[in-house]
């Protein structure tokens, strides 16, 4: 199946690397015009030059409401009315309840959670007349906290709650806007690689249906396929839903 997003306009935050990069490429391949934003301007500009005229890059601090306003205006001025928003940008910082630093916790909330709040607000404002899909990147840790990443877990739990609140609000207001979240266990991105303990190899953590069924990490393109599903009309009956890409971890309580 191709061209599932023909005629659609999408914005992907954190789109210059990792999952965001794979999402940008996949949505373009399915016919959408795709804007992507990132704090890394050099990487973003280089990628935009490679992707062609149906894409555009905007430097974006997702924790800044002023930046959001500028980005939304620039995207719609050049590409047209927004149909799909992927709130993907985020950070991962360690810290348990005894040793975690308040400044790290505040930064996690600002980038992982406040950005989604602002994005949903501005996404709804842009789509309420025409409809669309908002997709928030959460984590399995929103339901199964990681003790060494207490602040990160809390920031993603808030994303889960914000998603449901936004979906309910859109329904009650009569907006044809769907709001859903994706909850991966692990994604093998540069950010994850940097956090792995010494001696832990890609093969040890990566899920493989034949070689490592217990693996808890997935390649970014697998998660991008879930984003495509939620962005397309194939998921038209879904709003306020959570897609768990966790290989049954929640059911096992691990």
Curated annotation (Swiss-Prot):
Query: Which keywords fit this entry according to its UniProt record?
Result: Lipid metabolism, NAD, Oxidoreductase, Steroid metabolism
Q: Which residues form the active site?
A: 152
Q: Which residues bind NAD(+)?
A: 12-40, 61, 156
Q: What molecular functions are annotated in GO for this chain?
A: testosterone 17-beta-dehydrogenase (NADP+) activity; testosterone dehydrogenase (NAD+) activity
- GO biological process assignments: steroid metabolic process
Catalytic reaction(s) noted: testosterone + NAD(+) = androst-4-ene-3,17-dione + NADH + H(+); testosterone + NADP(+) = androst-4-ene-3,17-dione + NADPH + H(+)
Binding positions for substrate per the UniProt entry: 139
- In Pfam terms, one family for this protein is adh_short_C2
Superkingdom in the source lineage: Bacteria
> Its Enzyme Commission number?
1.1.1.51
Oxidoreductase: is it a keyword of this entry? Answer: yes
PROSITE patterns listed in its UniProt record: ADH_SHORT
In which family does this protein belong, per the annotation?
Answer: Belongs to the short-chain dehydrogenases/reductases (SDR) family.
Subunit architecture:
Homotetramer.
What is this protein identified as?
3-beta-hydroxysteroid dehydrogenase
Annotated organism of origin: Comamonas testosteroni (Pseudomonas testosteroni)
């Amino acid at each position: 199946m191709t061209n599932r997003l023909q005629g659609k306009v999408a914005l992907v935050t954190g789109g210059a690397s990792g999952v965001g990069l794979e999402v940008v490429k996949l949505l373009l391949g399915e016919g959408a015009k795709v804007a992507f934003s990132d704090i890394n301007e050099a990487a973003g500009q280089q990628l935009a030059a490679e992707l062609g005229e149906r894409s555009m890059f905007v430097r974006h601090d997702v924790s800044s409401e002023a930046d959001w306003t500028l980005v939304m205006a620039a995207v719609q001025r050049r590409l047209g009315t927004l149909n799909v928003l992927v709130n993907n940008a985020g950070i991962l910082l360690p810290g348990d309840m005894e040793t975690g630093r308040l400044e790290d916790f505040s930064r996690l909330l600002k980038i992982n959670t406040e950005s989604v709040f602002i994005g949903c607000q501005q996404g709804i404002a842009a789509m309420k007349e025409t409809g669309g899909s908002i997709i928030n990147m959460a984590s399995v840790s929103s339901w199964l906290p990681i003790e060494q990443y207490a602040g990160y877990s809390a920031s993603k739990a808030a994303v889960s709650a914000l998603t449901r609140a936004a979906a309910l609000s859109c329904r009650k207001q009569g907006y044809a806007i769907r709001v859903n979240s994706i909850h991966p266990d692990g994604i093998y991105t540069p950010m994850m690689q940097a956090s792995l303990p010494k001696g832990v190899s890609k093969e040890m953590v990566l899920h493989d249906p034949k070689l490592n069924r217990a693996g808890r990490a997935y390649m970014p393109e697998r998660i991008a396929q879930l984003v495509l599903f939620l962005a397309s009309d194939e998921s038209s009956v879904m709003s306020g839903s959570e897609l768990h890409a966790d290989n049954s971890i929640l059911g096992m309580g691990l």
